[in-house]
Every structure is written in structure tokens, then in C-alpha cells.
């Protein structure tokens, strides 16, 4: 078992030849008593749900509230025109993140990674990485186990709850997990993966949770797209050999401190931020008649 990113990196290097996925599978057995076959089967199911949520989310159908829906399809059409400013892989990830979260807003089945509100980042980065890197099925599962390993530390030492730590804890954690797994999938070391986490979280520090009308739609859906995009930049920076001046575990500690200091208006209560704007209040009244 590991209790910090430093310990995770050391154990992966010393005991698992740098294979973070194998470390996580072993840790899962230690925590739950599940045998390897069951652990793999459950992760297979997660992978299936993630891929399906990307495909189903490309629909142009609106959510019941009318706040979201159709943006993933718009971005898909834009990508297919071949005149995008952003790299195809990164923009594909952004599209897929929007797709998953629009699917979630329409009561579709998603895999909380680590939460439903931040469920778009990891599937988006993974599916884009499959295209870019040609990941095998086994490598796709390794991607998810590795993301889970790093996410476990973040959850235990900071938070993955918007109600507790703001959106930095939800989309921030999801983006960081994705960046770490992506770094490994591209041939990086566990240490480089840890640096990718630091880059993402430092960029996300202080991000509030301010859902309009209290629904996980605005600004949540688009924040997932940005989080997926950040993951690619962070992974590239780490693979280039860039290092965080602040150790990653201290960055995670700072994330916890910042989240704990946020006023309740900025922690999923829909009482501040974008939710409290005139338009945010108007939309809430239109939806709930309040």
C-alpha cells in the first residue's frame, strides 16, 4: 500500500519494474480481497461503459433541463472540416469529454472517474490516446489502473468532492489522473507521471464548484473538455523532462488546504460564482420555477 505519490513511484520502480498498473492491481487485492481475475473483470466493465458513453454522447439531443446537449456533435462536425487550430488528438479529447458529460446530463450511464461531474476527462483522454498511440486492450486497462493508483492518493490526501474541495477536487483530480496515465502510456516513467499530476493540479488550484441551478451541466461539461486538454499539455511537459519546483505531494497538500478554505458558496451549493450571476439565476427559475 502507498500513502503518497512519492511512495507510489518508489514502490512501482522497486517492486513492479515501473508498472503502476500492476501495483494498483496488487493494492486492490490488499484493500478488497478481490482476486486478480475479478479486479480485471470489473475494470473491463468500466472500460466498456467509458467507450459507450463517448459514442452515445455524440448525439445532438438536449438534456431535460435544456442547459446542455449537442456541443459534442458541433465539435465533431468542426473537427471533420479539417480546419481546426488545435491538434487533432487534443481536440478529439475535448470533444469526447463533452460527449461523456452531455450523456451524463441526459441520465446516461457513465463511469465516475473519480465523480460523475468529472466523468468526461479520463474516457476522453484514453480514447484519444488509443487513436494516437495505438494502445492494445491490455494497455487500455493498464491506463485505467494507473489512473486509479494516482487518484487513490489524491482522494486520500486531498479530495475528489466538489462539495468538499471545489471543482479543483473534481475536474482537477480527473485531469491529473488522466495526465499521469497518459504519460505512462506514452512511455514515460512513474516519476514523470507524478510531474504531470503536479502541473495539472497547480493549474487548477482554486477552481470553484458553481453549478448553475445546482445541476451538473453548466459549467461542468465544458470544464471537463478543458481538463482533458490540460492532461495532454501536462503529459508532454513531463515527457520533455520538465519538473515541478514544488514536490507533487506538497501540491496535493496545497490542493486540500485551498479546498478547505473555499467559502461554502463555492462548493457545489449553487450560491456563488456562475450560479449566482443574473443569467445563472434566471436559468434556475426557468428550470425549477423558483
Residue spans for each PLM region:
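Acidic-glycine-rich active-site phosphate/pyrophosphate-binding loop
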Residues: 87-104, 139-158, 202-211, 270, ...
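Alpha-helical support elements that line or immediately flank enzyme active sites
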Residues: 123-134, 182-187
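Glycine- and acidic-residue-rich phosphate-binding/metal-coordinating active-site segment common to enzymes
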Residues: 144, 150-163, 167-177, 182
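Functionally critical mobile loop/hinge segments
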Residues: 184-290
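Well-ordered alpha-helical segments within folded domains of soluble proteins
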Residues: 118-127, 175-180, 228-234
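Generic N-terminal targeting/processing segments that precede catalytic cores or assembly contacts
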Residues: 1-108, 130-132, 241, 248-290
Amino acid at each position: 500500500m502507498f500513502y503518497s505519490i512519492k511512495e507510489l513511484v518508489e514502490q512501482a520502480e522497486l517492486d513492479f519494474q515501473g508498472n503502476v498498473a500492476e501495483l494498483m492491481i496488487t493494492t486492490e487485492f490488499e484493500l478488497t480481497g478481490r482476486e486478480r481475475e475479478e479486479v480485471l473483470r470489473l475494470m473491463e466493465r468500466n472500460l466498456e461503459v467509458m467507450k459507450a458513453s463517448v459514442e452515445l454522447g455524440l448525439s445532438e439531443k438536449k438534456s431535460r433541463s435544456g442547459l446542455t446537449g449537442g456541443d459534442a456533435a458541433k465539435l465533431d462536425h468542426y473537427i471533420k472540416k479539417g480546419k481546426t487550430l488545435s491538434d487533432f488528438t487534443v481536440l478529439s479529447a475535448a470533444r469526447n469529454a463533452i460527449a461523456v458529460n452531455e450523456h451524463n446530463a441526459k441520465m446516461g450511464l457513465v463511469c465516475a472517474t473519480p465523480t460523475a461531474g468529472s466523468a468526461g476527462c479520463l474516457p476522453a483522454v484514453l480514447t484519444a490516446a488509443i487513436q494516437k498511440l495505438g494502445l492494445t486492450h491490455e494497455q487500455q486497462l493498464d491506463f485505467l489502473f494507473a489512473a486509479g493508483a494516482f487518484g487513490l492518493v489524491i482522494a486520500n490526501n486531498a479530495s475528489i468532492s466538489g462539495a468538499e474541495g471545489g471543482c479543483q477536487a473534481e475536474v482537477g483530480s480527473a485531469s491529473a489522473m488522466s495526465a499521469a496515465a497518459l504519460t505512462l502510456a506514452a512511455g514515460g516513467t512513474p516519476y514523470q507521471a507524478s510531474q504531470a499530476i503536479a502541473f495539472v493540479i497547480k493549474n487548477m488550484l482554486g477552481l470553484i464548484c458553481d453549478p448553475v441551478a445546482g445541476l451538473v451541466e453548466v459549467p461542468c461539461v465544458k470544464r471537463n473538455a478543458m481538463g482533458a486538454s490540460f492532461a495532454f499539455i501536462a503529459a508532454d511537459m513531463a515527457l520533455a523532462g520538465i519538473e515541478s519546483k514544488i514536490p507533487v505531494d506538497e501540491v496535493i497538500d496545497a490542493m486540500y488546504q485551498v479546498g478547505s478554505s473555499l467559502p461554502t458558496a463555492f462548493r457545489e451549493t449553487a450560491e456563488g460564482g456562475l450560479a449566482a450571476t443574473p443569467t445563472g439565476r434566471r436559468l434556475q427559475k426557468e428550470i425549477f420555477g423558483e
